[in-house]
Swiss-Prot record:
This is Argininosuccinate synthase. Pathway: Amino-acid biosynthesis; L-arginine biosynthesis; L-arginine from L-ornithine and carbamoyl phosphate: step 2/3. L-citrulline binds at residues 91, 96, 127, 131, 181, 190, 266, 278. ATP binds at residues 11-19, 38, 121. Homotetramer. SUPFAM superfamilies: Adenine nucleotide alpha hydrolases-like (SSF52402), Argininosuccinate synthetase, C-terminal domain (SSF69864). It comes from the Bacteria. It catalyses: L-citrulline + L-aspartate + ATP = 2-(N(omega)-L-arginino)succinate + AMP + diphosphate + H(+). It comes from Campylobacter hominis (strain ATCC BAA-381 / DSM 21671 / CCUG 45161 / LMG 19568 / NCTC 13146 / CH001A). Its EC number is 6.3.4.5. GO terms for biological process: argininosuccinate metabolic process; L-arginine biosynthetic process; urea cycle. L-aspartate binds at residues 123, 127-128. GO terms for cellular component: cytoplasm. One of its GO terms (molecular function) is argininosuccinate synthase activity.
Length: 406
C-alpha cells in the first residue's frame, strides 16, 4: 500500500536513475512531481536538466534549480574545515557535507509548493539515504519520504533502461560520461564501482577527471599565501575572495599541481566497507593551511581538546547528523576556538604535496621567540623545569619505590 501522497519534491539530477524515478512516482503514487536541482559546483550545465524535466511533463512552475555554491561553502564547508574534520583519518567528507544542504531545500520547496513528501535517488545500501532522510526529519518531523530504491523491483541497469524506453525517457549517453558511480561538487569528486570494487585493483589512470597526475604536474613549485580571519580563509595572495571563489581558486591551484587524490576503504554507517577514490584539491590545501595558522594562534589545551573531539564531529557529519543538537554543540565549541585564528600562511605546492613554509599572526600569535629561543634569554628560568619534572614524575617514583614494574 503506497503512502497517501498528492505532491512530492524529487531531488533531480537529470540522469537515468532520477528520470526513471520521476515517471515511477507518477505511475505508482499517482501524484504531482516537483523537481529540485542544486548547483553546488558540480561543473555541469543545468539548462538541459530543466529541458528534460519539461519534456517529461513537469510543469514549468514545478521545476526548481538553485545556485547554492556560496551557501554550500560558507555555511557547510567552512564550518567543517574550522574543525579540521577528517573521517577515519583520511576522508575530507566531500559527499557527506553536501547532503544536509540538499535536504534543507527539499523541505523548504515542499513547504513552498504545499507538497506532502520528498523523494531521493539514493540506494538502500549507501549512506546517502540516511543523510537525506535524517536531515529532512530534523527540519520537518511530519514530512513523508519516498525512497524508490527501497521499494521498486528495478534493481538492475537493464531494468532501468527498459523502463526508460517504455516511458519515452531520453537515455542518450553524455559524451565522455564516466562509467564509474560519481558524485561531484565544489569540494570534491568521488568515484565508486566497477574495478574499484576490488580493493587490490589500482584505479585506471584515466579515471581521475580533475587533478593532474602528480608525476606530470609542473616541475616548478608554486608558493601561495592564504589569509585567515576567525578560522576562515578570506584572501588568496592578497586578494579578498568570497567563500565559493576561494574554494574554486584553491581547486584550480591544487588540480594543477596534482594535489588531493585519495584511495581509501571506509566504513559506511550502514555497516559495510566500501572502497572509494576522491579528488579534493582545494580542501586538501585548506586543511593544511588551517592547521598551520591554528598552530600559532590556539592555546595548547584548546588545540588538544579540539583534536580529541574532531573524530566525533567528523563521524556525525559522515553519518548524516548535521542538524543534530550534538553537532550544533560541538560547532559552538569549535567556533569559540576560532576567535583568535587570524593571520597568514605561506604554502608551497609541488607534485601532489602541500608544504607549509611560513605562518604569521601579527595580532594573535602565541609564539614568543623570547621563550622558545635556543639562544640566551632573560625571560625563562631553566631551573624552574626541575620542579615541574619532579612533580610529574612523583607517581612513577612512588610506584617504583613500592616495587611496581612497568
Amino acid at each position: 500500500m503506497k503512502k497517501n501522497v498528492k505532491k512530492v519534491v524529487l531531488a533531480y539530477s537529470g540522469g537515468l536513475d532520477t528520470s526513471v524515478i520521476l515517471k515511477w512516482l507518477e505511475d505508482n503514487y499517482k501524484c504531482e512531481v516537483v523537481t529540485f536541482t542544486a548547483d553546488i559546483g558540480q561543473n555541469e550545465d543545468l539548462k538541459p536538466i530543466k529541458e528534460k524535466a519539461l519534456k517529461l511533463g513537469i510543469k514549468k512552475e514545478n521545476i526548481f534549480i538553485k545556485d547554492l555554491r556560496e551557501e554550500f561553502v560558507r555555511d557547510y564547508v567552512f564550518p567543517m574545515f574550522r574543525a579540521n574534520a577528517v573521517y577515519e583519518g583520511e576522508y575530507l567528507l566531500g559527499t557527506s557535507i553536501a547532503r544536509p544542504l540538499i535536504s534543507k531545500y527539499l523541505v523548504e520547496i515542499a513547504k513552498k509548493t504545499n507538497a506532502d513528501a520528498i523523494a531521493h535517488g539514493a540506494t538502500g545500501k549507501g549512506n546517502d539515504q540516511v543523510r537525506f532522510e535524517l536531515g529532512a526529519y530534523a527540519l520537518n518531523p511530519n514530512i513523508k519520504v519516498i525512497a524508490p530504491w527501497r521499494e521498486w523491483d528495478l534493481n538492475s541497469r537493464e531494468k532501468l533502461l527498459a523502463y526508460a524506453e517504455k516511458n519515452g525517457i531520453d537515455i542518450a549517453k553524455k559524451k565522455g560520461k564516466s562509467p564509474y558511480s560519481m558524485d561531484a561538487n565544489l569540494l570534491h569528486i568521488s568515484y565508486e564501482g566497477l574495478v574499484l570494487e576490488d580493493p587490490n585493483h589500482a584505479p585506471e589512470a584515466d579515471m581521475w577527471r580533475w587533478t593532474t597526475d602528480p608525476k606530470l604536474a609542473p616541475n616548478e613549485s608554486e608558493i601561495i599565501e592564504i589569509e585567515y580571519k576567525n578560522g576562515n580563509p578570506i584572501a588568496l595572495n592578497g586578494k579578498n575572495l568570497k567563500p565559493h571563489e576561494m574554494l574554486n581558486e584553491l581547486n584550480n591551484l591544487g588540480a594543477k599541481h596534482g594535489i588531493g587524490r585519495l584511495d581509501i576503504v571506509e566504513n559506511r554507517f550502514v555497516g559495510m566497507k566500501s572502497r572509494g577514490c576522491y579528488e579534493t584539491p582545494g580542501g586538501t590545501i585548506m586543511l593544511k593551511a588551517h592547521r598551520a595558522i591554528e598552530s600559532i594562534t590556539i592555546d595548547k589545551g584548546a588545540a588538544h581538546l579540539k583534536d580529541e573531539l574532531m573524530p566525533k564531529y567528523a563521524e556525525l557529519i559522515y553519518n548524516g547528523f548535521w542538524f543534530s543538537p550534538e553537532r550544533s554543540m560541538l560547532q559552538a565549541l569549535i567556533d569559540k576556538s576560532q576567535e583568535y585564528v587570524n593571520g597568514k600562511v605561506k604554502l608551497e605546492l609541488y607534485k601532489g604535496n602541500v608544504i607549509v613554509i611560513g605562518r604569521e599572526s601579527k595580532s594573535d600569535t602565541l609564539f614568543n621567540v623570547n621563550f622558545s629561543t635556543f639562544e640566551e634569554d632573560s625571560v625563562y628560568n631553566q631551573k624552574d623545569a626541575e620542579g615541574f619534572i619532579k612533580l610529574n614524575a612523583l607517581r612513577f617514583i612512588i610506584a617504583g619505590k613500592n616495587g611496581r614494574k612497568i
